[in-house]
Amino acid sequence: MKIIHILIASFLLPLVCSGQNPIIQTKYTADPAPLVYNDTVFLYTSHDEDDAFGFKMQDWLLYTSTDMVNWTEHGVIASLKDFRWVPYDNGAWAPQCVRRNNKFYLYCPMPNGIG
């Protein structure tokens, strides 16, 4: 009987642990970096194209919300192409945005440690 309870629990546990309100449902993203300013959450993510074998990350995206339920996509906010000195077309990893002295700075790590 104990084994039956364990089996039932092992099948039900994934249902309870799954996300009930995924923020981004139409694109592949990674490395979410939230920033709260006034009454808005700004969510910066790296963007993985779905047409590649492995990964193809060339740009960064922005999403915002004032209630953490409804999100607005603002599209690409920066791309590897924006940095002429970057000789790569893949590797747009984990962004981070910070506010300092009433200015916002988007930190974008570059491939192979050149940034």
What are these regions (language model features)?
Residues 1-20:
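Bacterial Sec-dependent N-terminal signal peptides
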Residues 17-115:
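Carbohydrate-active catalytic/glycan-binding domains of CAZyme proteins
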